[in-house]
UniProtKB/Swiss-Prot annotation:
Metabolic or biological pathway, per its Swiss-Prot or TrEMBL entry: Nucleotide-sugar biosynthesis; GDP-alpha-D-mannose biosynthesis; alpha-D-mannose 1-phosphate from D-fructose 6-phosphate: step 2/2
The name this protein goes by in its record: Phosphohexose mutases
InterPro entries per the UniProt record, alphabetical: A-D-PHexomutase_a/b/a-I, A-D-PHexomutase_a/b/a-I/II/III, A-D-PHexomutase_a/b/a-II, A-D-PHexomutase_a/b/a-III, A-D-PHexomutase_C, A-D-PHexomutase_C_sf, A-D-PHexomutase_CS, Alpha-D-phosphohexomutase_SF
Sites where the protein binds Mg(2+): S97, D237, D239, D241
An example molecular function term from Gene Ontology annotations: phosphoglucomutase activity
Keyword hit for Magnesium: yes
Amino acid sequence: MTLPAFKAYDIRGRVPDELNEDLARRIGVALAAQLDQGPVVLGHDVRLASPALQEALSAGLRASGREVIDIGLCGTEEVYFQTDHLKAAGGVMVTASHNPMDYNGMKLVREQARPISSDTGLFAIRDTVAADTAAAGEPTAAEHSRTDKTAYLEHLLSYVDRSTLKPLKLVVNAGNGGAGLIVDLLAPHLPFEFVRVFHEPDGNFPNGIPNPLLQENRDATAKAVKEHGADFGIAWDGDFDRCFFFDHTGRFIEGYYLVGLLAQAILAKQPGGKVVHDPRLTWNTVEMVEDAGGIPVLCKSGHAFIKEKMRSENAVYGGEMSAHHYFREFAYADSGMIPWLLIAELVSQSGRSLADLVEARMQKFPCSGEINFKVDDAKAAVARVMAHYGDQSPELDYTDGISADFGQWRFNLRSSNTEPLLRLNVETRGDAALLETRTQEISNLLRG
């Protein structure tokens, strides 16, 4: 049995060919054997196939004697939070996040919301399912419904001093995913006026797949910000583990610049803490962390690596330019809700707009944003780039792909973990012309 839905960090595949209820039940049985004793938290996103997949997964777990705590329709971070908060043995979120319509998937964690990825149990689960030893009888253990979100909401609100918040006008675009439900529950506790875009959860995704990185999806948020004169805008993906920001002019803010901003917000509350960041773009983050009295810690990108490094370093915050933001008190997990609350607090307390907060940073360290290249021979393409710049003796780092520092500019080039792509990021020290030149130069070399 080939199981293409099992990836390095999660399970993702087409329904029903690569992921279906029979497979979900078998995954439940195999997962039960991987976890310590205790209940398992299950939740699902708005996709039409998700409730049935969760029910099948639950049946497999309960047939193996596992009590299941069903938290229902939710975001991925709610499964992480409840797994830790309820001291469960593990948790599974049934979601395909921003993947195409016909996809679904699962994100799995063990106790304390620790990720289950390829080398920490996911491939062992795959092998058990593939060996066809994961058949199960009738469910014997109980399933309990727990849809009370009070503890989660209180935790989110604990990150900000509500007495300092101003009556901001915020555009919120849930993309017909699950984020709108949480915004509505938070709204009575906050002084903000919300302009709701694509707000209702709808697994048919009438306004397109909730992926704010797609230009057509950005346009709706940007347009609403400008039309309503909002202070800033926020858009989420389907399971709202990532959030994206737009300033009051409707301009999309590159995720890189949010990492330094959020680091400073957290360090103001927890002085001297460590901040974990990825190697793709670094100069702005390092400077902002150090200016705030924190200690920057470099780590390979990817949630499993960031969370592990944060735990070993006792870091207060971790940020990736891909809009994943991790918080120590949130079980070291990523949240798409905590960041916008912190940014709203920062805007309120500083009296400055989001545009103003990031503009100087964007001028000081302009970046290319991540550019993807489909290449037939990745090694040969990278070799061309390194041969071209080798005589300039850059400072090299191999934490994640290749990072090359030339003093006034740097680049990171890495292979995608999930697709046949090379990903390029370039930044300079305040030189937009140099950025354009070097980005074009490397792009030409990669294309051969």
